[in-house]
């Protein structure tokens, strides 16, 4: 059993010690998972965009990725994302631990439970139309608390809380869209947070995210033209902090789950 899984992108490929690649065939496609050691335990890592970072956000096979971790009996997932700042107070370089999200994607496969597919969760079959709750916590409170505690231990400043807005991509958002997201209460905007978080909940897996602000979103604080190079540059500067933060977080995550995430399917697993 692998207790903790990590989903991330560039810069984290060398995170694990003694890594090996395992290909898992899921009902939703295959997934290459890197298994290795971190913080004294075996950990699974999935490069969200593929090993060569070839998949755009809307083509990522989120269901295969999450189900592969389910097959490994992962209970906790720590994810990382690069985000733009909707809230002017969140400067580039800020690390945000979001507490909620708004899903503005349009054409992604967002659920395991389409009424026809049967899947296994903790060795038990689940099928039909399943409606999981995203309240009272959208992201796992135990992982979030562990991330924040780890950051405090490191002396690393993080923003506790924020609303993540997920867009389809590949283009960056328009100034009008960002104004609309701000009115809706959004703080940061990215392209990979959904449906990842809700799919984890559908598998009763705890999930939380570490979001790195790489730029101001369109029209915020004078932002004019956004470039992918800008995003990569800022994220690369923070990769050492993020890597250490993940390791310190794993050391602090409780071995026994007491959060509501574990009971997400309780009414369906009878």
UniProtKB/Swiss-Prot annotation:
Record EC number: 2.4.2.1
**CDD domains tied to this protein:** MTAP_SsMTAPII_like_MTIP
Q: Name one GO cellular component term.
A: cytosol
Residues engaged in binding phosphate: 10, 48-49, 192
Q: What else is known?
A: Although this enzyme belongs to the family of MTA phosphorylases based on sequence homology, it has been shown that conserved amino acid substitutions in the substrate binding pocket convert the substrate specificity of this enzyme from 6-aminopurines to 6-oxopurines.
Q: Which PANTHER family match?
A: S-METHYL-5'-THIOADENOSINE PHOSPHORYLASE
| Protein name, as recorded | Probable 6-oxopurine nucleoside phosphorylase
